[in-house]
A protein has these predicted regions:
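Conserved N-terminal helix/loop that builds the PLP phosphate-binding region
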Residues: 1-20
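PLP-dependent aminotransferase class I/II
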Residues: 11, 36-44, 48-54, 127-131, ...
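Conserved N-terminal alpha-helix of the aminotransferase class I/II PLP-enzyme fold
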Residues: 14-62, 84, 304
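Phosphate-binding glycine-rich loop
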Residues: 36-78, 89-96, 102-104, 169
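PLP-dependent aminotransferase-like
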Residues: 69-165
Length: 411
């Protein structure tokens, strides 16, 4: 009977369903402004990453906006960007009058190709955003060496790389500063939030001043995020997914809806004005959630890492880029390259495993934006990288179904 309900969703919220309901109820009356509680979370988070300071904003894109703004880079300065990321980061870079410049990826670690990065940096390059995709650790020491030699400002985006390490040092602790997004389905999910980290006291002081100028938070925005989180949690609940969500996805597919992206397709049009919502304060309620989530993230990661390793062991002929340096990664997503992703996903779904591809944008391919260009490796990662379910709250039955399915695909 249990095995009947063991079909596996593509992902899951880290909060339990009970916690999601409790958070929704608590958020209705919880105090939103409490600087002491926010600072407590910031201190704990900074210590956890191995940084001296943390400053919290409503979104990662907001933190990146201010990190670039306080550097006072001249308009027209180039910012090296990952070809795969969220569109909001591109929007804030352009809003500051800066020019995006893309560098292609390394196929095995989803981060910048070292030689291509070195070749791309010139006298007009002022900053770089190093993004770690899917919980995979690149040779960050080499990338930092290249950037420091060329004297450019290094910002790490480790939103998908929490707890991944290089030389026993956590990603997010290498650059001049770093950013973590605590949005839905992240390892630490506080119903939104973008956290800025640095050891540079002067830089942090400037960021703190920007934080103080943010608009007051609005409870309705927080409630919407928590409700959306709860709905996703319900949809991926083991029983509800098997009875309702999985049949719904099949029906949508029949009627021509693209259901192969992780969280669906997103608007690709440039925004004319940055929304005020991006500049509202992070709340004390979110900080309280963060303090609680910090205590369990490592144990959750251990479960996911063990699952990822077993999947790769069970499928020796499937091309997993993350096999290289596998003990350094945390596998926020486990990525298999497929020659025909549509068929690969269809076969997995026929075996009860809901696989998908990334919902992140191929920024370098957005024709409506300046700087668009061909990035062959990034295009392969974006179009042919299939996510094998790899989340921490999988049941034993769900894990076994993934192992069995991947063995059949591999044979």
């Amino acid at each position: 009977m249990i095995y009947m309900f063991s079909k596996v969703p593509r992902g899951s919220i880290n909060h339990s369903l009970v916690d999601s309901v409790a958070y929704l109820l608590q958020s209705i009356t919880s105090k939103l402004k409490n600087d002491k509680k926010i600072f407590e979370f910031e201190e704990l988070f900074a210590q956890y990453i191995g940084r001296k300071y943390c400053v919290s904003f409503p979104f990662a894109r907001t933190a990146i906006y201010f990190a670039l703004k306080v550097k006072n880079l001249p308009k027209g300065t180039e910012v090296i960007m990952p070809p795969i990321s969220i569109k909001g980061i591109l929007d804030v870079v352009l809003s500051l009058g800066l020019i995006p410049k893309y560098v292609d990826l390394d196929l095995n670690n989803f981060c910048f190709d070292e030689q291509k990065l070195s070749n791309a940096i010139d006298e007009n390059t002022g900053a770089i955003i190093i993004t770690y995709l899917f919980g995979t650790a690149p040779n960050i020491e080499k990338l930092i060496e290249i950037c420091k030699r060329k004297k450019i400002f290094v910002l790490e985006d480790f939103s998908q790389g929490l707890n991944a390490t290089v030389s026993k040092k956590k990603l997010g602790s290498f650059g001049d500063c770093s950013i973590y997004s605590s949005s839905a389905i992240k390892q630490i999910d506080t119903f939104g939030g973008g956290h800025f980290f640095s050891d540079d006291k002067e830089l942090v002081s400037r960021m703190r001043k920007e934080q103080e100028q943010l608009y007051p938070s609005k409870r309705i925005f927080l409630l919407k995020k928590i409700l959306r989180n709860l709905m996703y949690n319900l949809a991926t609940n083991q029983i509800i997914f098997n009875i309702f969500t999985d049949p719904l996805l099949k029906a949508l597919k029949i009627f021509g809806t693209d259901v192969n992206r992780m969280t669906g397709n997103r608007d690709q049009q440039p925004i004319k004005v940055i929304p005020n919502e991006w500049f509202r304060s992070y709340t004390a309620f979110q900080a309280c959630v963060g303090i609680r989530e910090l205590k369990k993230v490592q144990s959750f990661d251990h479960k996911r890492i063990a699952h990822a390793h077993k999947v790769m062991e069970n499928a020796p002929s499937i091309d997993f880029g993350q096999r290289t340096n596998k003990d350094q990664h945390t596998y926020w997503q486990l990525v298999a390259y497929a020659k025909n992703p549509e068929t690969f996903i269809k076969n997995l779904r026929s075996l009860g495993v809901d696989a998908c591809t990334s919902s992140l944008e191929l920024l370098s391919g957005l024709k409506e934006y300046p700087g668009s260009t061909n990035m062959p490796v990034a295009e392969k990662v974006h179009s042919k990288g299939v996510f094998i379910p790899c989340f921490s709250r999988m049941s034993k039955w769900q894990k076994n179904r993934v192992y069995e399915a991947i063995e059949i695909i591999d044979s």
